Amino acid sequence: MESYDVIANQPVVIDNGSGVIKAGFAGDQIPKYCFPNYVGRPKHVRVMAGALEGDIFIGPKAEEHRGLLSIRYPMEHGIVKDWNDMERIWQYVYSKDQLQTFSEEHPVLLTEAPLNPRKNRERAAEVFFETFNVPALFISMQAVLSLYATGRTTGVVLDSGDGVTHAVPIYEGFAMPHSIMRIDIAGRDVSRFLRLYLRKEGYDFHSSSEFEIVKAIKERACYLSINPQKDETLETEKAQYYLPDGSTIEIGPSRFRAPELLFRPDLIGEESEGIHEVLVFAIQKSDMDLRRTLFSNIVLSGGSTLFKGWSLPSAPCPRKLPQSCQAQTPREMTRESPFLPIQVLVTGY
């Protein structure tokens, strides 16, 4: 096959998230495959012939047998820490269990978080060109693609996933690098914070596979409180969660205390802005003539924006902004007023 014919083939799209990796072909409405971005290794000695075979497990098989495995994520806060495991996961994407295609025959669109180290991008390119021999590679910011998915070319994308939270203002298809805001507080930090609260309530989840149970509890039981100070004084309704072994646990105030970390990173000693401040600061760093348009086109993306309680156009804003922001921000952004002139879209799979 000639090189031109190869480049003209349908590109492979790999959304390389810190917690979940999604893969498919360009032009499809949804990803073809989606699985956790981790590698599992057996932590027990194999003593029977019929035991699970293999030293490394990825994808659905790792999910199915995670109780026997030591789970390790190759990415932390959007940056690859273990390139050997990351390469194994990408190899699995092309395997017969996933896309069932040859990497040499398809260009690749790879996503990454903004403001990542340049070395991270260079190493990814090196792996795809030298190991997988792809004919072409394009690395794009996740936020830009989220805006494209809504059919818009102007807006500000607040993307909060498993490893990174960032706000990216885009105007008529142009991202504004000087206005991009990023904090390394996201879903995995909320899961760890929830695990700490559950331990205080008498439920101990210490192994790497049990951490995935905490993550599932977070996704199903946690919510954002509009007024956390008030909820602390009230008798919080407890939610029951069924564990894989059939037992149940009751979760109380931890349901709203853990996600509060997104708005108050100081709860774990981090000196960074909350997710609501990141959004406003990113818009404020943009040109004054563009701010009203950006405030009118806010796109939420990423798994950590799926908590119950995220503000919709008819609901009050979950957090009051600092006094320094309120003077330059539409008054509807404060807690007491609804999001009347602001259009919020939620995108994701």
Swiss-Prot record:
TM spans (from-to): none
Subcellular location: Cytoplasm, Cytoskeleton; Cytoplasm, Cytoskeleton, Microtubule organizing center, Centrosome; Cytoplasm, Cell cortex
Residues with the N-acetylmethionine modification: M1
Recorded coiled-coil stretches: none
A Pfam family of this chain: Actin
One GO MF term attached to the UniProt entry: ATP binding
Gene Ontology cellular-component annotations: cell cortex; centrosome; dynactin complex
SUPFAM superfamilies: Actin-like ATPase domain
Keywords, comma-separated and alphabetical: Acetylation, ATP-binding, Cytoplasm, Cytoskeleton, Nucleotide-binding
Subunit description: Part of the ACTR1A/ACTB filament around which the dynactin complex is built. The filament contains 8 copies of ACTR1A and 1 ACTB. Interacts with dynein and adapters such as BICD2. Interacts with BCCIP (isoform 2/alpha).
Entry similarity comment: Belongs to the actin family. ARP1 subfamily.
The protein's role, per its UniProt record: Part of the ACTR1A/ACTB filament around which the dynactin complex is built. The dynactin multiprotein complex activates the molecular motor dynein for ultra-processive transport along microtubules.
Name under which the protein is recorded: Alpha-centractin
